[in-house]
Amino acid sequence: MTNIRKTHPLIKIINHSFIDLPTPSNISAWWNLGSLLGLCLAIQILTGLFLAMHYTSDTMTAFSSVTHICRDVNYGWLIRYMHANGASMFFICLFLHVGRGLYYGSYTYFETWNVGVILLFAVMATAFMGYVLPWGQMSFWGATVITNLLSAIPYIGTTLVEWIWGGFSVDKATLTRFFAFHFVLPFIIAALVMVHLLFLHETGSNNPSGLISDSDKIPFHPYYTIKDILGVLLLILALMTLVLFSPDLLGDPDNYTPANPLSTPPHIKPEWYFLFAYAILRSIPNKLGGVLALVFSILILMLFPLLHLSKQRSMMFRPLSQCMFWILVADLFTLTWIGGQPVEHPFIIIGQLASILYFTIILTILPAASLIENKLLKW
């Protein structure tokens, strides 16, 4: 009798995706991040579902419903902080996953890559709307500032902003629709993840060397299932350490003050994972220019397959490109730091220089480094 996992219409899909999947024998721990992102999404959907059972999306009761979850619901504090810090872990894994793709040239699978960039946008949109829901000061003012950016769009901007708000300011209608979108988007993300994996399994995984590995493949199970379990344990350890020892480490104290449209916080800033984009936005004195720079700071990832001029896929054997890559990483850390600082000297000029460097490295320096390396290798 043939094994059911190879014949059953549903089980064989799982079999071809997670069990008998031919996988390169040399993929490193950087390839664990995909499964960790899947785990993060599962954690966020589950904790979010339980939070939604107790949350009310009304301006009068939203803040107190979150307080009620933390104080009165059994382990409500745990669910709430797992959800809040789970978002941070999600973004850490996302940034590492994207960085891995850039370093090892995984972006040459451009369908997989482009679906991944769309996923990044979807996760960022979901996280932004989720941050508005507790209806604290930073929730309200963050929502006001970021949605207001759309008014920079010529001709339709103001109408568009009021349409999104459902009125003339961020109010009850805005909160209700943000809750609806925040609830539904993770399921759309889950569907996009399936598409992402579908495209990936058409080509098979890349590997650190960037060479074709068809002649040396091993089954995903048990080798990489065991390896992924180690990653899962480390992720859960990190998340639970954060949740149980310093749950508010990555949050903003202003969000423990209920939203007040009449009192602006001294420094409006988003969660840490948006600070690099926020710094790029603020570094341009023009509103529309800033919004375009903000969008292109992420959208530029879609250009990587076009900007790949090297004869080698991976950066593993390209020291010059490696150097530029790590300067880009350092630049992103600088932008993240600047995004959390007030708009004053010397932070303004540092932010502007870091923003220019970000786009320059990606658009000119990395492709130039690739051409130099090709020349040095006489290719």
Swiss-Prot record:
Heme b b562 binds at H83, H182. GO terms for biological process: mitochondrial electron transport, ubiquinol to cytochrome c. The keyword Transport applies. Heme b b566 binds at H97, H196. Keywords: Electron transport, Heme, Iron, Membrane, Metal-binding, Mitochondrion, Mitochondrion inner membrane, Respiratory chain, Transmembrane, Transmembrane helix, Transport, Ubiquinone. Binds 2 heme b groups non-covalently. It is found in: Mitochondrion inner membrane. It is a multi-pass membrane protein. One of its GO terms (cellular component) is respiratory chain complex III. Its main location: mitochondrion. One of its GO terms (molecular function) is metal ion binding. The chain crosses the membrane at residues 33-53, 77-98, 113-133, 178-198, 226-246, 288-308, 320-340, 347-367. A ubiquinone binds at H201. The keyword Oxidoreductase does not apply. PROSITE patterns: CYTB_CTER, CYTB_NTER. InterPro entries: Cyt_b/b6_C (IPR005798), Cyt_b/b6_C_sf (IPR036150), Cyt_b/b6_N (IPR005797), Cytb/b6-like_sf (IPR027387), Cytochrome_b (IPR030689), Cytochrome_b_C_euk/bac (IPR048260), Cytochrome_b_N_euk/bac (IPR048259), Di-haem_cyt_TM (IPR016174). Its cofactor is heme b. The cytochrome bc1 complex contains 11 subunits: 3 respiratory subunits (MT-CYB, CYC1 and UQCRFS1), 2 core proteins (UQCRC1 and UQCRC2) and 6 low-molecular weight proteins (UQCRH/QCR6, UQCRB/QCR7, UQCRQ/QCR8, UQCR10/QCR9, UQCR11/QCR10 and a cleavage product of UQCRFS1). This cytochrome bc1 complex then forms a dimer. Component of the ubiquinol-cytochrome c reductase complex (complex III or cytochrome b-c1 complex) that is part of the mitochondrial respiratory chain. The b-c1 complex mediates electron transfer from ubiquinol to cytochrome c. Contributes to the generation of a proton gradient across the mitochondrial membrane that is then used for ATP synthesis. Belongs to the cytochrome b family. Heme 1 (or BL or b562) is low-potential and absorbs at about 562 nm, and heme 2 (or BH or b566) is high-potential and absorbs at about 566 nm. PANTHER family: CYTOCHROME B. This is Cytochrome b.
